[in-house]
Amino acid sequence: MSTTDEDKKFLAVAIAEARQGRSEGGIPIGAALVVDGKVLAGGHNRRVQHGSAIHHGETNALENAGRQSASVYARSTMYTTLSPCHMCTGAILLYKIPRVVIGENQTFMGAEELLRLHGVEVVVLNDDTCVSMMKEFIAAEPSLWNEDIGEHD
């Protein structure tokens, strides 16, 4: 499936989540779980805010969606401002989410090939807002960024 106006609309929800996370002093990565053309839940990276090792944007969106049946996930798309890391990719695969729309993968290349290997449709938008948001954050807070992606300073 190609990029649609709907993809841009739902990526905007993830971007708003990312901005919210940054305004809270956190890392500007956001996500939205969309089912049947409606936002089921949004989320943003809350590792700093919650002192958490696992509250990335995608996992926070899944948490905010609450318990769902497998049939709901089977009809969903995960929108995320940044290419999903291995942990978030694992959650996407666990719940068999069939489609992931990524804002950008220039500042961080996640496990996109693993998603594709498991039959997930991956769409990368290379959105300028997502790229600039991450570049600005990484320049301002390199240590926090390295912590988030499991890298040494």
Language model features: what each stretch is:
Residues 23-27:
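A short helix-loop-beta-strand connector motif used in the catalytic cores of GNAT acetyltransferases and
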Residues 29-37:
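Short beta-strand scaffold segments in enzyme catalytic cores
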Residues 31, 69-70, 112:
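Short secondary-structure boundary/capping segments
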Residues 46-60:
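A short, polar/charged loop-to-alpha-helix boundary motif
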Residues 55, 78-98:
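Local cysteine-cluster metal-coordination motifs and their immediate loop/turn environment
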